[in-house]
Amino acid sequence: MGQLFNLPQVEDINYIQTVRAVRQFFKDYLTLRLMAGDRKFPNMTTMYKITPPNFSNEFHSKVEDAAIHNVDNVHAAQEAVKKYDAIMNQLEHIHRKILFEKFIHNLQDRTIMLDIPYEERQYKREKRKAVIELATTLGIEVLN
């Protein structure tokens, strides 16, 4: 009987390249947050829900068309941010904390490790689990 899901095994994942993919994801995530109108760093517990204005005019000027296009882009960015927030909120609290502090706040591993407080090996194991779990959920893991 075959497997129900064909998920990659941990040993099949190239961890270094996957960390680079996760780092790029967080750069893109922060850019999306700016496009969506969020100027601050995200909080782990906040969920954003913004609805765009409703335009019912049938005739538009070029300025109105540009504004509608911008609103559509903002709305698309807001929807993407909401989706990514939901994915990250499904992670374990400790994994979410490690990922946010490492990739969004750019803290050093030692600082995060002391804040948690975990020993170095335990921290590295949890960080590895967090990176692989997020990358697999997003489909951005890099296989060997």
From Swiss-Prot:
Classification via InterPro entries: ArpU-like
Domain of life per record: Viruses
Protein's recorded name: Protein Gp66
Organism: Listeria phage A118 (Bacteriophage A118)
